[in-house]
Swiss-Prot record:
It is found in: Membrane. GO terms for biological process: terpenoid biosynthetic process. This is Cytochrome P450 monooxygenase flvC. It comes from Aspergillus flavus (strain ATCC 200026 / FGSC A1120 / IAM 13836 / NRRL 3357 / JCM 12722 / SRRC 167). It is a single-pass membrane protein. Belongs to the cytochrome P450 family.
Length: 538
């Protein structure tokens, strides 16, 4: 009898038993600590939610509930101040989170907060305390790594690293710079109008939900690279890239809920095709090729593009060619982030704005008459943004569209620095992940009458923009805010002025439906419109 083999077998089983028992003790001990003894245990909320990430995984993944709906239910049941909605049951499985604790906090503060426990606030005061220029907090890696895993300005989680990158890129998206982009934007809008007219001549309704997404995609490619991807040319606006973006959003909850699975899939991405990854790779390669060619031949880069901004062209007086502002790898990641999918939120606002206009004949008429005042002839030049932004009703429509589409809907979580912070009058320890979803501000009856209704008139007169947070606020707010406003003005003004639109109410949903997948993932019927080119416009 092989006693040595038996002993080895028993020792292996014993070690496995000890390991499993140790993990169970840690698991149960952590849950009890988080639910009862943790500094955040004083806040109201279900104890299971405070004790374990699995509570949220169960409701979000297995029951299929939207995170914002879950948070609304929690605040309704436990109060409007703050609600714990996730513990740290799987810390031992997620090495990224362990590394984050080690790098970002002292062990003392990590033990105090037990690292990255999530806390959601619903008040405007809390929003202001979290998202302001003085809050130099990192992004929660758990939330952001599930949507983007790059070293782009958006993907960088460390505040100081992100600030350095934003300071470099921000001048390209300044108001003055965006004013020079109007030619490129109008070029793509003109092509959209041609496509809408073509569909009308074929006897078709136009799917404006897809049309706006294709338009926003082509605008971003034109602005960043000097050449669009041609998504507007796809039949019925059925761009594979747009469908890939939806596939990516559909996988967000899975990637967020199971970080270990996410890390494994990323590590074997060469062998396993992730949702939408094939299309992303194709378009990512196109961007990378533009960067390579631009670095090698900078004088061939089209003017007023982001690539041209990052790769300055040489001048006759320069002794040496100017160096790119970023490494080739970082430049490629930055441009890929902006080009692929960065126009999604503004496209959503276009859909909401046009839907709101067309559902109200009086509003349609009034907006049209306002635009005619500055654009008397349809075949005349499109008024510049400096003129359109002075139109009060058009501006009100855009603000209301932004309010009802929210931008990003998931709480943009920030990790409080060591030492803690005061949020809405409450001390929150360092290491806590805190956030407020834009939806809680935009849909609050404390700030808006009938918040679920499209009422542009609420923005006329002395109404304040304080509670409009679609682009977020603070040092990590949306860099493309000026560009987004410019697109919304030019797109809505052009369509209302140069296209006669019919809205078949029986084929459209009164309200746009979505699920929280970081950005809204829209479902239900798309916005269908019959579009006829206005007389005199060609």
């Amino acid at each position: 009898m092989d006693f040595g083999g038996i002993l080895l077998h028993l020792e292996a089983r014993s070690m496995a038993t000890v390991l499993i028992a140790g993990l169970l003790v840690y698991w149960v001990g952590s849950a009890i600590f988080l639910a009862v003894l943790h500094p955040l245990a004083k806040f109201p909320g279900p104890k299971l939610a405070a004790a374990s990430d699995w509570w949220l995984v169960y409701h979000e993944w297995f029951l299929g509930k939207s995170l914002t709906d879950i948070l609304f239910d929690l605040h309704q049941n436990y109060g409007t101040i703050n609600v714990p909605y996730g513990g740290l049951q799987d810390l031992w499985l997620d090495m990224d989170r362990i590394a984050y604790v080690v790098q970002s906090l002292t062990w003392e503060s990590a033990l105090e907060a037990n690292s990255l426990v999530k806390l959601h606030f619903s008040s405007m005061q809390a929003y202001s305390d979290i998202y302001n220029v003085k809050s130099k907090w990192d992004k929660d890696p758990e939330v952001y790594k599930a949507i983007v895993d790059t070293s782009s300005a958006f993907g960088l989680r460390n505040y100081h690293e992100a600030k350095e990158r934003r300071d470099l890129i921000w001048p390209f998206y300044s108001r003055q710079s965006v004013q020079r982009m109007q030619k490129a934007i109008n070029r793509q809008i003109s092509f959209l109008v041609d496509q809408l007219d073509k569909q009308n001549q074929e006897g078709k309704l136009s799917n404006m939900s897809m049309a706006f997404r294709c338009l926003a995609q082509d605008i971003m490619a034109d602005i960043c690279l000097g050449k669009s991807f041609g998504t507007l040319e796809e039949r019925d606006f059925g761009s594979p890239l747009i469908h890939a973006l939806d596939e990516g959003l559909e996988s967000y909850v899975l990637m967020k809920s199971f970080p270990t699975l996410r890390n494994i899939l990323y590590s074997i991405s060469a062998m396993v095709t992730l949702p939408g990854e094939a299309e992303f790779a194709t378009y990512g390669t196109i961007v990378a090729d533009h960067v390579t060619r631009g670095i090698q031949q900078p004088d061939t880069i089209p003017p007023n593009t982001m690539l041209g901004f990052l790769v300055p062209t040489s001048s006759n007086t320069a002794k040496e060619a100017p160096q790119p502002k970023l490494s080739q790898g970082h430049m490629t990641e930055e441009l890929q982030t902006f080009v692929i999918g960065a126009g999604e939120t503004v496209a959503s606002a276009m859909v909401q704005g046009l839907s709101g206009i067309l559902q109200s004949p009086d509003l349609y008429k009034n907006v049209y008459e306002e635009i005619v005042q500055v654009w008397p002839e349809t075949d005349g030049p499109v008024p510049p943004i400096e003129v359109l932004e002075k139109l009060p009703l058009l501006t009100a429509v855009i603000k209301e569209a932004l309010r009802l589409t929210h931008g990003v809907v998931t709480p943009l979580a920030r990790v409080i620095s060591a030492g803690g912070a005061c949020i809405d009058g409450h001390h929150v320890p360092g290491g806590t992940s805190v956030g407020t979803s834009h939806v809680f501000i935009h849909m609050s009856s404390d700030y808006y009458d009938a918040p679920d209704e499209f009422r542009p008139e609420r923005w006329l007169g002395s109404s304040s923009d304080k509670h409009l947070v679609a682009f977020s606020k603070g040092p990590r707010g949306c860099m493309g805010i000026n560009l987004a406003w410019c697109q919304l003005y030019l797109v809505l003004a052009t369509l209302v002025r140069t296209v006669q639109m019919e809205y078949p109410a029986d084929l459209n949903d009164i309200k746009i439906k979505w699920k929280d997948c970081f950005q809204p993932l829209y479902y239900g019927r798309p916005l269908q419109v019959r579009c006829t080119r206005a007389e005199g416009h060609s």
